[in-house]
Amino acid sequence: CFPPGIYCTPYLPCCWGICCGTCRNVCHLRIGKRATFQE
C-alpha cells in the first residue's frame, strides 16, 4: 500500500484491511497481519 500507513503500537499490534488503515489488538490468521508499519 502506498503511501505508508498507520503505525501500530504494542497495544494495537495488527494491521487490518488492504491498506492497513486500522490497527487492532487481535490478529486473525487470514485477515490480520502483525506489523509495525504497513508495507
From Swiss-Prot:
The UniProt similarity line reads: Belongs to the conotoxin I2 superfamily.
**Which locations, inside or outside the cell, does it occupy?**
Secreted
Q: Which residues carry this modification: Isoleucine amide?
A: I31
Q: Which organism is it from?
A: Conus emaciatus (False virgin cone)
Cellular component, GO annotation: extracellular region
Instruction: Tell me a Gene Ontology molecular-function term this record carries.
Output: toxin activity
Matching InterPro entries: Conotoxin-I_CS, Conotoxin_I2
Reported tissue expression: Expressed by the venom duct.
Q: Which residues form the propeptide?
A: 35-39
What is the recorded name of this protein? Kappa-conotoxin-like Em11.10
How does the entry describe the domains?
A: The cysteine framework is XI (C-C-CC-CC-C-C).
Q: Which UniProt keywords apply?
A: Amidation, Cleavage on pair of basic residues, Disulfide bond, Ion channel impairing toxin, Neurotoxin, Potassium channel impairing toxin, Secreted, Toxin, Voltage-gated potassium channel impairing toxin
- Summarize the protein's role: Inhibits the vertebrate voltage-gated potassium channels Kv1.1/KCNA1 and Kv1.3/KCNA3.
Identify the main location.
Answer: secreted
- Looking at the Swiss-Prot or TrEMBL record, what is one Pfam family this protein matches? Conotoxin_I2
Cysteine pairs bridged by disulfides in the record: C1-C15, C8-C20, C14-C23, C19-C27
